[in-house]
Design a protein with these regions (language model features):
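General beta-strand structural signal in soluble alpha/beta enzymes
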Residues: 24, 48-51, 77-79
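Short, ordered loop/turn segments at secondary-structure junctions
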Residues: 27-29, 53-55, 80-83
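Rossmann-fold NAD(P)-binding glycine/threonine-rich loop
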Residues: 6-18, 25-48, 59, 63-68
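Short amphipathic alpha-helical face segments that pack within enzyme cores
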Residues: 56-63, 95, 169
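Short glycine- and Lys/Arg-enriched binding-loop motifs that mark or flank ligand-binding interfaces
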Residues: 21, 53, 87
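C-terminal substrate-binding/catalytic lobe of Rossmann-fold NAD(P)-dependent oxidoreductases
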Residues: 73-78, 82-193
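Short, conserved glycine- and acidic-residue-centered signature motifs
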Residues: 4, 8, 30, 89, ...
């Protein structure tokens, strides 16, 4: 299911009692739905995999960000998607920001501007990671995380140029759901990272 959080809940409640394994590719799934999915997966011995992103590069980006985070004091994340993307920032951007902050073990420096000439120009801030979102035609999904420290920056970037980038992860999740009863959240768990 790749609809939305509400659709994901409906699919889980419909499929699990029928002993059908489930793969969900929606973001913004509330904790209550995750708890229900965990309960239903256990009760009916089915595999339920919920992954906010199926692009291997995006999953690896999140992992690399966590490794790099302790060595830097500043972090800015820019995400750009197609104009029909309904949420901002994207679920992947939120996951990258949260994982980056976890890797840091605290908050990054996010100094507010002394004078902001256009409101919101510096973006939103999540645990010190400043997040900027753009929506426009000609894009699929792009995430760029720039770390900063005295005299240096480190950039980690992932670009999904076409939706084909999601297929290897989807196929992996479908194959894994059959072998992995219970709830699994995130493709990183399947990859073992």
């Amino acid at each position: 299911d790749f609809t939305n959080a509400e659709g994901a809940s409906t699919v889980i409640h419909t499929a699990a009692p029928r002993k059908i394994n489930v793969v969900i590719g929606s973001t913004g799934i509330p904790e209550s739905t995750l708890n229900e999915a965990d309960k239903l997966a256990s009760e009916y011995s089915v595999g339920i995999i919920i992954a906010p992103n199926f692009a291997m590069g995006a999953v690896l980006m999140e992992h690399l960000a966590k490794i790099a985070a302790p060595f830097f004091d500043y972090a800015d994340l820019t995400e750009t998607h197609h104009e029909k993307k309904i949420d901002a920032p994207s679920g992947t951007a939120l996951a990258i920001a949260k994982t980056t902050a976890e890797g840091k073990g605290g908050s990054f420096n996010a100094p507010p501007p002394e004078k902001e000439l256009v409101a919101g120009t510096r973006g939103g801030v999540l645990k010190g990671v400043t997040i900027h979102s753009a929506r426009m035609p000609g894009r699929v999904a792009h995430h760029e995380l720039i770390f900063g420290a005295l005299g240096q920056t480190l950039t980690i970037r992932h670009d999904s140029i076409s939706r084909d980038s999601f297929m290897p992860g989807v196929i992996m999740a479908v194959r894994e759901a059959v072998k992995r009863p219970g709830l699994t959240v995130g493709l990183d768990k399947i990859l073992g990272i």
